[in-house]
Amino acid sequence: MAVPKRRVSHTRAAKRRTHYKLTLPMPVKDADGTWRMPHHMNMTTGEYKTTKA
């Protein structure tokens, strides 16, 4: 089993953690002007990929 030889310093751990970030969801605008999440159904019209769901 892999065990660290030395303790990881606070600075080194913080530098590694800088890459742990969340991305904001990017909604898309439909043809009727409403906003929805990509690959999701439009909740106002009930359509998904131009077909009624």
From Swiss-Prot:
Q: Name one Pfam family in it.
A: Ribosomal_L32p
Provide this UniProt record's keywords sorted from A to Z. Answer: Ribonucleoprotein, Ribosomal protein
Q: What is this protein called?
A: Large ribosomal subunit protein bL32
Q: Which GO terms describe its biological process?
A: translation
Q: Name the gene.
A: rpmF
Compositional bias per record (Basic residues), positions renumbered to this chain: 1-20
Q: Which GO terms describe its molecular function?
A: structural constituent of ribosome
Give the UniProt family note.
Belongs to the bacterial ribosomal protein bL32 family.
Q: Where is the composition biased (Polar residues)?
A: 42-53
Alphabetized InterPro entries for the sequence: Ribosomal_bL32, Ribosomal_bL32_bact, Ribosomal_zn-bd
Annotated segments matching region Disordered: 1-53
GO cellular component terms, alphabetically, are:
large ribosomal subunit
